[in-house]
A protein has these predicted regions:
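Glycine/serine-rich phosphate-binding loop and adjoining beta1-alpha1 elements at the start
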Residues: 2, 8, 77-169
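Single conserved hydrophobic/aromatic residue that forms the stacking wall/gate
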Residues: 237-246
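An N-terminal-biased, well-structured beta-alpha scaffold segment characteristic
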Residues: 2-110
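Short beta->alpha connector loops at strand-helix junctions that form conserved
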Residues: 36-37, 60-61, 94-96, 116-121, ...
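Glycine-rich phosphate/diphosphate-binding loop of Rossmann-like nucleotide-binding domains
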Residues: 6-40, 155-232
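Short gly/ser/thr-rich secondary-structure transition/capping motifs
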Residues: 52-58, 73-75, 151-157, 215-221
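Generic structural signal for well-ordered, non-membrane alpha-helical segments
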Residues: 15, 19, 43, 97-100, ...
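An anion/phosphate-binding loop that grips the pyrophosphate of nucleotide cofactors and donors
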Residues: 68, 232-233
C-alpha cells in the first residue's frame, strides 16, 4: 500500500501522523511511505529521520494526497484539504464527526473511507487510540486549571499545591475515566487536595487503590455534588458516555 503523511495545517497543531519508528515498521512490511517536506519538524523529526528509515519526501501536501492510497494524519482534514481527497481513498485520523457537520458532509460527498481513531474499539469496549489523547487532555486540564487560579488570569490567586503554612487548593474532578484519573494524578502530584467523583463504584474502588493518598473518591449523587461544589477552588468535568466501562 502507498501511505501518505501530510503536514498538519490546523491552527496550532504541531504533531505528525507517523514517527520515524512507525514508518520503519511499515516499510519493513513492504509498504511505501511518502512524507510531506517538514511534516515532522515541529515534533522533532527532520526529513532526514524519515528518509533514513525508507520514507520518501514530497514537497507539497497536494502531491502527498495525489499519490497515497491511505492518508495518515493526527487531526481531521480542514477545508483546504477537502478537494484533495478522492473517492475510495483511506483516511486514518481523529475525526470527531459529531461536532462538525461541514466535515461530515464533505467526507460523504468525496466518497472517502474514513477510519476515525476515536471510534476504534476493542472487544472489551475500550478505545485504545483515544486513550493517549485522553491522558494528555486530563493532564493539560489540570495544568490549565492551575493557571486560571492565578490572579492575572482572573482567578482567586490560589496556588494549586499551596505552600508551607497555606492550605492547597481544593480540586473536584467529575468523571473517573481516563481523562479524569489523569487529571487527578496531575493535581495530586502538584500537591492539591483532590476529590474525584463518579457513579461507578467499581471504578472508584480501583481509583482509591491506584491514585496517590491525597486523592479522595466520592459517589457522584446530586446531593453530594451540590454540597461539594461550593467548597472547591477548581472543578474539572471529564464525564463520558455511561455505557463505556473505561
Amino acid at each position: 500500500m502507498i501511505i501518505g503523511v501530510p503536514k498538519e495545517i490546523k491552527n496550532n497543531e504541531n504533531r505528525v501522523g507517523m514517527t520515524p519508528s512507525g514508518v520503519a515498521e511499515i516499510v519493513k512490511r513492504g509498504h511505501t511511505v511518502y512524507i510531506q517536506h517538514t511534516a515532522g519538524i515541529n515534533s522533532g523529526f527532520p526529513d532526514a529521520a524519515y528518509t533514513a528509515v525508507g520514507a520518501q519526501i514530497l514537497p507539497t501536501m497536494e502531491e502527498v494526497y495525489a499519490i497515497a492510497e491511505m492518508i495518515v494524519k493526527v487531526k481531521e482534514p480542514i477545508a483546504p484539504e477537502y478537494k484533495l481527497i478522492r473517492k475510495g481513498q483511506l483516511l486514518f485520523t481523529y475525526f470527531h464527526f459529531a461536532s462538525d457537520k461541514e466535515l461530515t458532509l464533505a467526507m460523504i460527498e468525496n466518497g472517502s473511507v474514513c477510519l476515525a481513531y476515536e471510534t476504534v474499539e476493542k472487544a472489551d469496549h475500550s478505545l485504545p487510540l483515544l486513550i493517549p489523547m485522553s491522558e494528555v487532555a486530563g493532564r493539560m486540564a489540570t495544568q490549565e486549571g492551575a493557571r486560571f487560579l492565578e490572579r492575572p488570569q482572573g482567578g482567586k490567586g490560589i496556588l494549586l499545591g499551596g505552600v508551607p503554612g497555606v492550605k492547597p487548593a481544593k480540586v473536584l474532578i467529575l468523571g473517573g475515566g481516563i481523562v479524569g484519573s489523569n487529571a487527578a494524578q496531575m493535581a495530586a502530584g502538584m500537591g492539591a487536595d483532590v476529590t474525584i467523583a463518579d457513579i461507578n463504584l467499581a471504578r472508584l474502588r480501583y481509583l482509591s487503590e491506584t491514585l496517590p493518598p491525597n486523592v479522595k473518591t466520592l459517589y457522584a449523587s446530586e446531593l453530594r455534588l451540590k454540597m461539594e461544589l461550593p467548597t472547591v477552588d477548581l472543578s474539572l468535568i471529564h464525564i463520558s458516555e455511561p455505557t463505556r466501562p473505561y
